[in-house]
Amino acid sequence: YKRQIFTTGIDMKEKLEESLKKAIKNASRSPAPPKLAAAMDYAIFPGGARVRPQLSLAVSNACGLDNFDLSMASAVSVEMMHCASLVHDDLPAFDNAEVRRGKPTVHKAFDEPLAVLCGDSLIILAIQVLTAKGLSAPERLGKLINVLTTSTGMPYGICSGQGWESEKTIDLSSYHKLKTASLFVAATKMGAISAGEDPEPWAELGQRIGEAFQVADDLKDFSDSQKSGKSNNRDKENERPNAVLKLGEQGAIKRLQDI
């Protein structure tokens, strides 16, 4: 494979955005229904920090980035899964959030049926993008799909974490690992796999970043919604697990520092 190393973070972000736009454009071609296509575009752009896909690309970069297209597809698929989870998480059945990334959530901007279909379509698109670029490296593709689906399904992924919100009691650390850290772990492991390297040494990095990210998000849930860009105090209103609610603000800060 030809090596192609990112020289700057800006270069990485620009190529990532180009790839995301291309994926959404391909999914929006005729005979795609215009409203659903618009909802998918709305869910992806403008993006947030793109932490997960950039983390995946950074790991690929550190591993030599010997298959640029596959590493980029891996990063795009991680972001697609993440955005799909946000669309579903914001629905009235879950958080009933009205604002995400400083604008109305998908079900508010469109409607609930389109939001459900949008999330579902992004999940499928994540797999499509990955397989399209992975056929040239089948030995890596199988591992990538396994990591991505494991991190999003049952019993180790986002769906499992979301499901725990319906239980009466839950260990906060386990909840954070499943709902948030699992996709960060996927990002680091997929970054390594797509570059032909062993993913396991990178798993702990994803785990720690993911847990820290969720605790920080829990703290942000009690901040000003104009600053955070999303609906706040939803965890308290919906009785969701939250580090601040369980540990107090200072306890949550200490937990963040310990991670």
Q: PLM ranges: what are they?
A:
Residues 6-21, 33, 37:
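Onset of an N-terminal alpha helix
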Residues 1-4:
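Conserved small/polar residues in nucleotide/adenosyl-binding loops
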Residues 28:
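Cationic, histidine-enriched alpha-helical/coil surfaces that engage anionic ligands
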Residues 25:
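Glycine-rich, acidic and aromatic/proline-enriched surface loops and short helix-turn segments
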Residues 31-259:
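Mg2+-dependent prenyl diphosphate-binding active-site environment of isoprenoid biosynthetic enzymes
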